[in-house]
Amino acid sequence: MPTPHPLIASWARSAVVPRNGAFKALGVHEIAAPVIQSLLARAGLDTQQVDAVVMGNALAAGGNPARLLALHAGLSPSCAAYTLDTQCCAGLDAVAMGAALIASGQAHVVVAGGAEAWSRSPIRMHRPLTTGSQAVAYERPAFAPTPEQDPDMLLSAARYAANAGYTRAQQEAYAIESHTRALAHQAVMANEIVPIMGVTHDVYPRALDAMRAARMPLVARTDAAAADDTCALSTLTVSAQADGAAFVLLVSPQACEEFKLSAKATWIAHASIGTAPQTPLLAAELAAQKVLQLAGFNDAKTMRFVELHDAFAVQGLSFSQGLGLRSEQVNPRGGGLSRGHPIGASAAIALVRLLADLENNPQPDMHGLVAVAGAGGLGSAAVIANQSP
């Protein structure tokens, strides 16, 4: 007998706030706890009924912040807690792990998603190798064994843009459209956002035009010596560092019946994949292709909604072109490019966006796709089905 698909009974997220903004004094558990409390209240489920919390996080520097979060949110001390770090993929991978716990019968009620307090991330230092030498600060850990395999993410995206022929103007047009969509749909997205520190909407989206975009500072080009800006990346075409959290409530059919919960969506399939670490942004498309096959779909165009966490404008352009998707089909309310990038939370936020759009546009047998690429050449994607009206 096939295992029943895990059900999704509730979801919520915080606003996304740029680093050193309104959330700058909050720890990751302090951003995430109100989100979890809200999604449980929306479902009508007691905090003591949660079997496990799975949280994606990239910057808290260990210590299993999911356990701290579970206790801070008032969940039972018996609640299991797992912290998962697959960088940008972590929020979606955490939900996949939660779904696997339910599908395997190890849990019946799981809260899963991601959270990041980039503003409070620890300063990283390598310990001195010898007595009397100094500790050495570093920005991030290595994602691949050699420097050639592990380029700076901005440089990697700029190289890909140049090699694939995506111009700065094309990238800026994509970014402007993302911000325009986000601003136009703030009222719609307010329903999924839990107010924290008085912030009720994503802070970063702004009104832009081509003239203003052209004045944005450059952050990466393929060859600084040649000063070739044709395919360069600017602050507009790269997702901003940010704080935020997003979680979903996963339940088994048994728990749904026992606790009289209303299932709003079904977790159909998930895929994780790796690709060349030199071009990590391509992993989202590869993961999407794999999960579509697992879910029994031959074409991404059959998805009613598609959410991509687009850390770079060139990534969004490449993803849509590679899968043959229409512009309006991908990130219809704006994506990570206009929201910001709270690394461990970003993919979970994209999932919440997808779930909200599926619920707000009910049609029979409707499916959606969410995808993300992560540092080191990782990709993660999932297919979700709505509950038919």
Predicted features and spans:
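Active-site-proximal alpha-helical scaffold in enzymes
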Residues: 86-116, 161-189, 248-254, 320, ...
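Active-site pocket-shaping loop/turn-to-helix segments
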Residues: 13-37, 60, 82-96, 108, ...
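N-terminal extracellular/periplasmic Venus flytrap/periplasmic-binding protein-like
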Residues: 13-14, 25-26, 42, 170-258, ...
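Active-site pocket-lining segment
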Residues: 268, 274-338
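Phosphate/pyrophosphate-binding loops at sites that engage ATP/ADP/AMP, CoA/4′-phosphopantetheine
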Residues: 37-49, 160-165, 256-263, 289-304, ...
